[in-house]
UniProtKB/Swiss-Prot annotation:
Residues 278-292, 798-817, 994-1014 have a biased composition (Low complexity). Keywords: Acetylation, Cell cycle, Chromosome, DNA damage, DNA repair, Isopeptide bond, Nucleus, Phosphoprotein, Repeat, Ubl conjugation. The modification Phosphothreonine is found at residues 4, 146, 222, 300, 316, 356, 382, 440, 466, 889, 951, 1054. Homodimer. Interacts with H2AX, which requires phosphorylation of H2AX on 'Ser-139'. Interacts with the MRN complex, composed of MRE11, RAD50, and NBN. Interacts with CHEK2, which requires ATM-mediated phosphorylation of 'Thr-68' within the FHA domain of CHEK2. Interacts constitutively with the BRCA1-BARD1 complex, SMC1A and TP53BP1. Interacts with ATM and FANCD2, and these interactions are reduced upon DNA damage. Also interacts with the PRKDC complex, composed of XRCC6/KU70, XRCC5/KU80 and PRKDC/XRCC7. Residues 54-105 form the FHA domain. There is a cross-link at residue 1034 (Glycyl lysine isopeptide (Lys-Gly) (interchain with G-Cter in SUMO1)). Tandemly repeated BRCT domains are characteristic of proteins involved in DNA damage signaling. In MDC1, these repeats are required for localization to chromatin which flanks sites of DNA damage marked by 'Ser-139' phosphorylation of H2AX. This is Mediator of DNA damage checkpoint protein 1. Residues 1-22, 156-394, 409-634, 714-744, 772-1086 are annotated as: Disordered.
């Protein structure tokens, strides 16, 4: 392997370039270019155009950024759907218009025009010419890992348009941008998406990797891509790609970290990513998905091609591709036995089919999963280098994963499917993994349990996959042998790549395991460092923490999950999810995120293999989507992916379960089966690190959350019920202690992915991830395994957002097998939740605002409660996903079952809660479509106990879990019912959580937020769908929001559902906020009016969040513009005192999944405020206190500009009375507004002594909210 991974950096860089064009076909290569002719604005300049949406505008986010006043912020869009198709030019409602020169034609906004080669275009006054570049069709042959192309959603491709601009140039700098760019390119040919060889992948241009990778890396393991989104995208890449690319350390702690095999440039990014990924062991899956996003040039390209949706732009594509991929499930097996327990992350191509294999592999300690973990390790080891490499690896892995997932989806045979998909992924990963022979790296990280593998060389990327193999477990990987082979020898790995199909056949699970494994394992190892209790894992966690400061934070989170084994996993997931959330827009790739990481911890304490399942890829997508969302709110293509996502749910599976059982679960294509052995003291500390990262995403998450809340609320009740039923029945069936933990992990993982993401966001927002993590640590002490689960869960959660639904479905399907590892996992989650309080408030408020969000998020939140720190962040994104996806994915029952079971488990209750939560979040989402009482019971039970324990004490978490699982189940139901009425507080009381209510609420908020945010990225797509459907309505009713939120909370309280717990916490501590925000948001159901800007992306965000577009100022509740301008609408808004907000408010709200509080997004225009000597904030404040012209009667003469009707509108909005005719009597405060031309008309008024004022009395007076007629009297000279 090492030989294979040996990378000649110089050569690789060239290779990278080659690969970007060749391997990916079109991923990195520009499809065309815009040549702007020289003129007064400057010299001639060329802008490359990539697949997807290329936005032309003044905004620096635009692909074609023209920083000139005549160009609108988003002037026009050139969408390239495929390399061989003519680009579509659309004007975005620009101020100065877009014209075709020959024949002369002005493009009306929204009208499409097919560009011909050499066609001349006029953007405002900037002439340019479109040139088509001869780009060879995507090389499908190169992608042994070609994924069955999932329906690529053009919307996604569009989503990436804004990001695209950054992609090529800002790839490194702007992960999200890069992601998008890659994505857009990828979108062009989903089927063409090829997983470049690891070296080549590594070689891919670094820029490609950093941007997208980084954003997606943030997401949790499940949402590897998602995790990668923010900045952890890199990390995710590191996980996925990193796992593949970084030199794998043979099995550190049974988890080998694959160093990114990516080329130098990528390596640099990968390293960075690795750091992030390191913390996001889970992110491996994400990496795979997000990997393209991560944009390792070669990897990313390959990945991108592989998973166009995976990329921010291609989010859609990746997600679509991921949809098939979603079948891939990652089971994160976290060995509870030892901190360094060789948790192996398995990327299961087909959660359903391969799960069994994966589980078996897990049972065997599947080395490949650990290898996957290795990828994570890579992350933490070398911050910069690893990150870069990780990004690359992540990209490669993501691609591979997507492909393998796609294959899994397409393949009918569960085991075979997984193998099949895996081989592709493996190939990609193998390329990465073998290239990275990071086994050593992984071992390095693994040995410490930290798995902070420093991906020394980009070649490590290839090895990443290989690395997955745990040191102790390598032998255990018979199925993984192929993967082992891949990882064992570079040649083998490459061979595996080439023979990926063979590998797949051998053991799709195995391959899957390997692919996802790196991420998870890495996370575990890396995260371990964070936690003191589990040295190896702590080390890993530490690495994660390192990463956490930057995108690594997310990665770290991902990593953490692995490191904590239980706690760390959560944390990692959180960070990843956070990332995903951040990448909210890009998070659109819900489908891709389907890939989930299943945390599997053996009760025996044997290293379990975390297996990344289909959810993870979705996570990556989510991440990407999120990024896209962040970069481009317009990337609404998420919705389609959401749909895909629903298909890609994770199944929760108990480790005790037989491989057969797993398989059956796996049969549900996108289901993740988390198997968590109880491992003491997962490094919860790692969670805090993710928290910090998470804090970055909180607002976005918050914004996304409201929707999640509503939707979740909606789904929450049914799901809760399901959970109760399914979970409870399952509970008895399985050994409470043993099985609960496993399912918990699963559910937890899945939900965590959802919740964690959300949590991440929240935590990011709160900057409290660290706290979360700490509580997690406590939980870890109590329920180490739960912690681990949590961590892993978060990873799944990251994927969960889309996968949340998926998970729900999966769980629904797998309801019968709720062993409820969830209970363990959930237990951990509550702890996390606890830690996450700080994060929670912000997130919570955001999240609560949207009932939909509350419902969906709550379930997710529940997960976070258990895994607040890690889970929550993941939960957020995941939740968002689930939320959006929830409408279409009614298969939450499965999660329900497991959730319930977790409650049974005493120690694992926390975890079960987590799982439950995750499940519930998903279930909730799904609930809308398919309410099943099963979930509710169990969920409520485990959640409450877990949540309470977590809340009151992370340590007690285990015990509360036991206690409250059943009561909570009913309680949750009850709460949901009552909570809906507004007893969010009530949930607080019932839960021991009440004490940590604040933290937990925060956590819950975080989760909700995260879910929302994840939703926004992931949820963005799903949310668009789900939120639009469910959320919108729910969001509309503040009461309902509260109620729904309560239900979510109720759901969250259920012990079975950690997610719910966080939601509950949110409702408890943050409930008021949530409630407050939601009611405002909902009550107001914002009616948004735009002035001076035409922003279809913003309009879509409004609609997706449940608001409406106002036709006039009179019915508007919010005015959106880009600067202070004295337009009639603007002045009317000032006169009425309605918030005048920047476009960023909509973008961030979209990411957060709900309308964020407007106060932070008031338009800022220091120049204009200085010119007119006023403060907009003060003016609005005065206008709200008292109308400026309340006592005034004003007549406006005909010659005044603006014309009298518009002046009359301004006067009315300021409380004045308009006199239709010239007044004939004097009265105080009766004035005439006129101009010099109309002075003759004013003779009577002048004789009466009525003040004759210039229009500035209104225009300036309204702006400053000062009525000073004497200052604007027309002088006698003028008269």
């Amino acid at each position: 392997m090492e030989n294979t991974q040996v990378i000649d950096w110089d050569a690789e860089e060239e290779e990278e370039t080659e690969i970007s064009s060749g391997s990916l076909g079109y991923s990195v290569e520009p499809i065309g270019r815009l040549r702007f002719f020289s003129g007064t604005h400057g010299p001639e300049r060329d802008f490359p155009l990539y697949l997807g949406k290329n936005v032309v505008g003044r905004s620096p986010d635009c692909s074609v950024a023209l920083p000139f006043p005549s160009i609108s912020k988003q002037h026009a869009v050139i969408e390239i759907s495929a390399w061989n198709k003519a680009p579509i030019l659309q004007d975005c409602g620009s101020l100065n218009g877009t014209q075709i020169v020959k024949p002369p034609r002005v493009l009306a906004p929204g009208v499409s025009h097919r560009l011909r080669d050499q066609e001349l275009i006029l953007f405002a006054d900037f002439p340019c010419q479109y040139h088509r570049l001869n780009v060879p069709p995507p090389l499908v042959p190169r992608s042994l890992l070609t994924i069955e192309k999932t329906p690529r959603i053009r919307g996604r491709s569009q989503n990436s348009r804004v990001l695209l601009a950054e992609d090529s140039e800002e790839e490194g700098d702007f992960p999200s941008g890069r992601s998008v760019a890659n994505g857009s390119r990828n979108t062009a040919s989903p089927s063409a998406t090829v997983v470049p060889e690891s070296d080549e992948e590594g070689s891919s241009p670094g820029p490609s990797v950093p941007g997208p990778s980084s954003p997606f890396g943030l997401g949790s393991d499940t949402d590897e891509s998602q995790g990668q989104q923010p900045g952890v995208e890199e990390s995710s890449l590191a996980d996925n790609s990193g796992a593949a690319g970084e030199p794998e350390q043979p099995e550190v702690n049974g988890v080998t970290t694959g160093t990114l095999a990516q080329p130098t440039k990528d390596k640099f990014k990968d390293t960075k990513m690795k750091e992030e990924a390191g913390s996001a062991g889970v992110p491996v899956g994400s990496v795979v998905e997000g990997s393209p996003t991560l944009g390792e040039d070669s990897d990313t390209e390959a990945d991108e091609e592989r998973q166009p949706s995976g990329s921010g732009d291609s989010d859609t594509d990746v997600e679509e591709e991921r949809v098939p991929v979603k079948k891939n499930q990652v089971l994160l097996g976290v060995g509870i036995g030892g901190p360094g327990a060789r948790g192996v992350a398995h990327l299961q191509d087909s959660p359903t089919g391969s799960d069994t294999d994966v589980e078996e592999d897990k049972t065997a300690l599947a080395a490949p999963p650990e290898r996957s973990h290795t990828a994570m390790v890579i992350n933490s080891d070398t911050d910069e280098e690893e990150r870069g490499e990780e990004e690359e690896v992540s990209a490669a892995l993501t691609l591979a994963r997507l492909k393998e997932r796609g294959i899994a989806l397409w393949s009918g045979e569960p085991g075979t499917e997984e193998v099949k998909s895996q081989p592709q992924v493996l190939v990609e990963r193998s390329q990465s993994a073998s290239g990275r022979d990071s086994d050593t790296d992984v071992e390095e990280g693994s040995s410490g349990g930290k798995r902070e593998i420093v991906p020394d060389s980009p070649m490590d990327v290839d090895e990443t996959l290989t690395v997955t193999q745990p040191e102790s477990q390598p032998p255990c990987r018979p199925n993984d042998v192929d993967e082992d082979v891949d990882m064992s020898s570079p040649g083998s790995h490459l061979e595996g790549k080439k023979a990926s199909s063979a590998l797949v056949d051998k053991n799709r699970a195995q391959v899957e395991e390997e692919v996802p494994g790196p991420s998870v394992t890495l996370g575990e190892k890396h995260q371990v460092p964070l936690e003191g209790a589990q040295p190896p894992e702590e080390a890993r966690e530490t690495a994660v923490q390192e990463g956490s400061s930057s995108p690594v934070a997310d990665i770290r989170m991902s990593q953490q999950p692995v490191a904590e084994d239980a706690g760390t996993e959560c944390a990692a997931a959180v960070s990843e999810q956070k990332s995903a959330l951040e990448v909210g827009a890009q998070s659109r790739s819900p489908a891709a995120p389907v890939e989930q990481v299943v945390v599997r911890t053996d009760t025996s304490g044997d290293p379990t293999l975390p297996q990344r399942e289909g959810a993870q890829t979705p996570t990556g997508r989510e991440r990407e989507a999120h990024v896209g969302g962040t970069k481009h709110a317009k990337e609404c293509c998420d919705e389609p992916e959401d749909l895909c996502l629903s298909a890609t749910q994770c199944f929760v599976e108990g480790e005790s379960q037989h491989p057969g059982a797993v398989q059956s679960l796996e049969d549900e294509p996108t289901q993740v089966f988390p198997c968590l052995p109880q491992e003491p003291g997962p490094s919860h500390l790692s969670l805090p690190t993710p928290g910090a990262d998470t804090l970055d995403v909180p607002w976005e998450v918050l914004a996304t959350q409201p929707f999640c809340l509503r939707e979740q609320t909606e789904t929450s009740e049914p799901i809760d019920t399901h959970e109760a039923h399914g979970s409870q029945p399952s509970l008895p069936g399985e050994p409470p202690g043993h099985q609960h933990p496993v399912p918990t992990s699963l559910d937890h993982t899945e939900l965590l992915r959802i919740d964690d993401r959300e949590m991440q966001t929240v935590e990011k927002a709160m900057g409290h991830l660290s706290c979360q993590m700490m509580p997690d640590g406590k939980a870890s002490g109590d329920d180490p395994e739960p912690s681990d689960h949590r961590l892993f869960s978060p990873v799944p959660e990251a994927s969960a957002s889309p996968q949340s639904l998926l998970t729900s479905q999966s769980q629904k399907q797998s309801t019968p097998q709720p062993m409820f590892p969830t209970s363990s996992s959930e237990l951990a989650l509550p702890e996390t939740l606890h830690t996450k309080p700080n994060v929670r408030p912000r997130r919570s408020s955001r999240m609560t605002p949207s009932p939909h969000s509350s419902a969906a998020l709550k379930p997710y939140t529940t997960c976070p409660t258990n895994q607040p720190a890690a889970s929550r962040p993941t939960s957020r994104p995941t939740r968002g996903r689930a939320n959006r996806s929830s409408t279409r994915t009614p298969e939450l029952i499965v999660p329900t079952g497991p959730e319930l079971q977790p409650s049974t488990s005493t120690e694992q209750p926390g975890i079960p809660n987590l799982t439950s939560q995750v499940t519930e979040g998903r279930a909730h989402s799904t609930s809308v479509n398919m309410p099943e009482p099963v979930l509710t019971g169990p969920e409520a039970q485990p959640l409450t106990s877990a949540e309470q324990s977590v809340t009151s004490n992370l340590n007690p978490r285990a015990q509360p879990l036991t206690l409250e699982p059943v009561p909570q189940t009913s309680h949750q139901r009850r709460r949901r019912a009552t909570g809906k009425q507004g007893s969010r507080t009530a949930p607080v009381g019932p839960k021991s959580y009440s004490t940590p209510a604040e933290p937990e609420p925060q956590s819950s908020a975080s989760q909700s937020s995260g879910a929302s945010e994840a939703d926004s990225p992931h949820q963005k797509r799903p949310r668009r769908q789900v939120t639009q459907k469910t959320v919108v309505v729910k969001e509309e009713d503040p009461g309902e929001i509260q109620v729904k939120e309560e239900p979510q909370e109720t759901a969250i309280p259920t012990p079975g559902k950690r997610k719910r717990d966080p939601a509950e916490g949110e409702t408890q501590g943050n409930p008021t906020r949530s409630r407050r925000t939601k009611p405002n948001q909902e009550a107001a159901a914002p009616k948004v009016l735009f002035t001076g800007v035409v922003d279809s992306r913003g309009e879509r965000a409004v609609l997706a969040l449940g608001g409406s577009l106002a036709s006039s100022v009179n019915e508007a509740s919010h005015l959106v513009t880009d600067r202070i301008r004295r337009t009639v609408k603007f002045l009317c808004a000032v006169g009425k005192g309605i918030p005048i907000l920047s476009l960023n408010w909509l973008y961030q709200s979209r990411k957060a999944g709900c309308f964020l509080p407007p106060d932070d997004y008031l338009v800022t225009d220091p120049e204009q405020e200085k010119n007119f000597s006023f403060s907009l904030r003060d003016s609005l404040s005065r206008a709200r206190e008292r109308r400026l012209l309340e006592d005034y009667e004003i007549h406006v003469t005909p010659g005044v500009q603006p014309p009298p009707p518009q002046m009359g509108e301004i006067i009315s909005c300021c409380g004045g009375t308009v006199l239709p005719s010239m007044p004939h009597s004097y009265k105080l405060h009766r004035v005439v507004i006129t101009c010099t031309e109309d002075l003759p008309r004013c003779a009577i008024a002048s004789r009466l002594g009525l003040p004759l004022l210039s229009p500035e009395f209104l225009l300036t007076g309204v702006l400053k909210q000062e009525a000073t007629p004497e200052a604007f009297v027309l002088s006698n000279l003028e008269m």
